[in-house]
Amino acid sequence: MPIDFNPHFYNNIQPQQQIINPQYMFQNQPIKDTFIKSADVKFDGMKIEKKSFGKIEKTGEKAYLYTITNKNGASVNLSTFGATITGIKVPDKDGNIIDVTHGYNDVTPYEKSPVGHAGGTIGPCANKIDGGKFKINDQEYQLECNKDNGSTHSHGGSEGFDVQNWKAKILRDGIEFSYIKKDMENGYPGNVKAKVIYKLDNDNNLHIQYKATSDKDTLINMTNHTYFNLDGAENTEENSVLDHIVEIPNSSTITKTNKISIPTGEFLNIKDTPFDFREEKKLKNVINSDHEQLKNTKGFDQNYCIDNYDGKTLIEAANVRSEKTGITLKVLTNLPGFQFYTANNLGKSSQPESKSGSRYEKRSGLCIEPQFYPNAINTESFKEKGILKAGEEYNREIVYSFGIEE
């Protein structure tokens, strides 16, 4: 059953008790996007700007960058290419507005060197599919195997949602991106109408809603792949995220995986392991622990299972804070799990320059990616498979809530 999207989330709400009120669903009517040059739109202290983000070489299309700014000066930059978050700026403890995400200055690096899927909308299916194969209604589908030396399909493949140019519509308090995936495009069945809606409120909460419909039963598992560094986006050097303090309050298990991060179907109780963040820990104190699952991934890159998940309630998945800036990040979702990733595979010499002019190195950011469990379609013990039935609606939500440490 789909839930209503609530743009009025407040920091003092207890996440597991939040009631989603239907009267708020898209109460702000869309404004026709007729802007050709940079445009300003203000509502209740909100400002939305649009400008060019460069030309996409493969298609010749133009990419655009939208910036939503709230009355506090917090903002989010969103590119039509990949429906991507290219920057999030929020106030620190001294009142300075700083960028806290990885990103690039124009579309070219996202198209030519999509290192780490930075900020992108991942789909049709996030994470890995073993062998790139799955069955729906006894029909077997073979996807591109673009990972692990051609043995797995990862993050929707090389032509996934994060490298498509989405259409954009300006809303009163956000942006709606839409993309139509054709039947069998990239190997996935169904003509899929996908939407990603970003809304920034005046409490510095960024709401992300994912919606999709299909004319055939298909696989849908969308997420966002933003890399956060709450010390500031300019901190690109190796291990620069390891002073972050992390709490994962509502997860008592992770999905156990093999050496290429395909789930075995077993659940690992995290008690007395380095994966237990039910009490907050500084990353540098646990990331190099002697545990097989941690060694396999060269740092944190695990799927955490969210306790008390019901598919409707926004549950507090993770909390992150920086002692340097005082910035806090709370992540909430109504998805069953999330991938916690500490950018262990960044730092390749071929990657492009960042928006600050340097290159992002290993462990210079962290990702919290709410989603269905990896390879769920092929794993008997995983209840939810990520199958979207023809004519039904996929409707899930992520909230990134920013604050200042008290």
Spans of features found by a protein language model:
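Non-Sec secretion/translocation targeting segments of pathogen effectors
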Residues: 1-43
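An exposed, glycine/acidic-rich loop-and-rim segment of catalytic or binding clefts
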Residues: 38-406
